[in-house]
Each structure stands twice: as C-alpha cells, then as structure tokens.
C-alpha cells in the first residue's frame, strides 16, 4: 500500500515561524467552518492554555504543528469535535493527520515526567522523544500491536460483539499481542480464548493505525478448523456464525474490521477487492 501523499509525518522545529496548527483539548480537536487547521499566528493571540507544542508534519506541503492544551476552552466561532467523529465522516487524510496528532498528544501528556525518578522531562530537538537527564532515559511514543481476524466457514463468517459495542453491532475478533508472542500466535490464542474455536490457513491482509489511543491493528483472515462457539465470559457478549447474505450491523466503513468483512464478501462474489483506508 502506498504512503499517503497529502499527509506526511515529520519532526518540525517549533521555533520556526509560520505554518498551520491543530489544537487538541480534553473535548477533542478545535474546528471552525474552514476545518481543523489554523494559522499559528492567529492561535498565538487566542490566550490558549498550551501545555506543549509539537511539529508533526506536512499537509499538502504546508507545515503543521500540534498545540496540546491543559483543557478545552471556548474560542469564538469554533467548536470541539472528538477524533472518532473525524474517522466516521469527512476527509480521511485529515483523520490520518489528527490520528497522528492524538498519539503524539497522548505521548506528551503521559511522559511529562520520568517514570523512573519523577523528574520533569524535556523534548529532544529533532527527535520524537522525551528525555530525562537524571536517568539518561529516552521516552518514545507508545505503539501497541494488536490483531484482528475474520474467521470464515464457506458462506458463513464468525462475528462477535463486546458489551462496549453500540447496540446490535457485531465485528471480527480482536486482541492485543502479548510480550514474546508473534502476531500469528496472538491470532490463534485470542480466537481460542474468545470463542473456543480452532483456525487454519491464516493470511495477513493489511494493517491500520488505530489511535484510540495508540494501537496498530494487524488484520488477518482465517478459516474455521474445529470447535463449537463458547463466548468468553465478560469479554464477549455474543458470538455466532452469520451467512454472508444475512449480516448484522457492522463496524464503520473506514475501519479495518469492515475492510476484512467487505474483502471476503468481494472474494466470494467475484467483485473487486475494496481498498483498506490508511
């Protein structure tokens, strides 16, 4: 999959003049009728409670910075919108930019102080890292690898729902990779833990950044081998086989979960394969 051209990440010098900025507070990202990117000079005059600033990349060639606020505040003519809403609608390249910004913001908030000694850290110029001088310790943004797998049995697909899902929605099985575990081992383990089913013919299908708050989703397809579905207590509210012509409400169109399902439906029908966003 080719790298997105409209949005590219970079470590920019916050001392450089000009450019645009996105603003994140505890209510999401600031936006107005023109979008989420504001001239840095204009933002400097808004008396915002800025906790930190980061140069995050280029959007259509324009340098973009991130202002992380101590809290969300009212700005005339503007509103706040959560990251998930940007994922569901609008320009996907903007969501990619904001997803990156959100992960940088999470990292900056969580590593203001050293976890070893408790002293304040400083940003390393030209590198996406915080530094504790006392412990000579570099602290990088956290990325949590996780897997998501669509298990199929001919014209049936195995879908499950978590108690956290919106009412009626089902999705593919997913879980986090454990230390010392390969992604493939994780798939087999999670499927067994969540529904007591054995799988075979595992195929990697693609990956997607999932900035809620810092996951990297590794997508797989697998075929059913054996076992009867037994949902994992407290984790899985319901799990069952669905015929491809009679599916329940599914995850958002731009999610890797939806892509895995749509890709299998296309494969069964001979339709063109969908494109995985991101």
From Swiss-Prot:
Disulfide bonds: none annotated. A divalent metal cation 1 binds at residues 174, 194, 235. Pfam families: NUDIX, NUDIX-like, Zn_ribbon_NUD. Its EC number is 3.6.1.-, 3.6.1.22. Substrate binds at residues 84, 127, 140, 208-215, 257. Its cofactor is Mg(2+); Mn(2+); Zn(2+). One of its GO terms (cellular component) is cytosol. It catalyses: a 5'-end NAD(+)-phospho-ribonucleoside in mRNA + H2O = a 5'-end phospho-adenosine-phospho-ribonucleoside in mRNA + beta-nicotinamide D-ribonucleotide + 2 H(+); NAD(+) + H2O = beta-nicotinamide D-ribonucleotide + AMP + 2 H(+); NADH + H2O = reduced beta-nicotinamide D-ribonucleotide + AMP + 2 H(+). It is an enzyme of class 3 (hydrolase). A motif (Nudix box) lies at residues 175-196. Belongs to the Nudix hydrolase family. NudC subfamily. This is NAD-capped RNA hydrolase NudC. The lineage of its organism: Bacteria, Pseudomonadati, Pseudomonadota, Gammaproteobacteria, Pseudomonadales. The gene is nudC.
